[in-house]
């Protein structure tokens, strides 16, 4: 069953995010069969005050999400994300199946 990685974060260094993090994370997402469904800052708050960036990535299953997050090649890339963002909230959630 598909699973989703949902990340809400405040990007405070856009040049670092776009110039360092994104080019390094995209090949790793491909390696793990991920599909980015939502990415960017063109969002409107329906309730509350969300950070300025939301990302939703679809994986084959929760094991694939954790495989990506725990990939040794991702660890230095994750450090870049931590450096250029704040207020990060990340969740891993399985796809909803009615009656399941």
Describe the residue ranges of each PLM region.
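C-terminal structural segments of small proteins and small subunits
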Residues: 66-68, 73-91
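Generic beta-strand structural signal
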Residues: 53-55, 88-89
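Basic side chains
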Residues: 18, 58, 78-81
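Short S/T/G/P-rich N-terminal loop/turn motif that feeds into the first structured element of a domain
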Residues: 1-53, 60-70, 94-100
């Amino acid at each position: 069953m598909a699973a989703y990685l949902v990340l809400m974060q405040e990007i405070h260094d856009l040049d670092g995010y776009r110039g360092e993090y994104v080019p390094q994370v995209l090949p790793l997402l491909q390696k793990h069969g991920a599909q980015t469904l939502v990415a960017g800052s063109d969002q409107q708050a329906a309730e509350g005050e969300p950070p300025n960036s939301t990302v939703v990535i679809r994986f084959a299953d929760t094991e694939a999400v954790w495989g990506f997050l725990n990939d040794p090649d991702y660890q230095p890339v994750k450090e870049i994300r931590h450096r250029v963002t704040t207020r990060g909230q990340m969740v891993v959630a399985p796809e909803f199946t009615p009656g399941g």
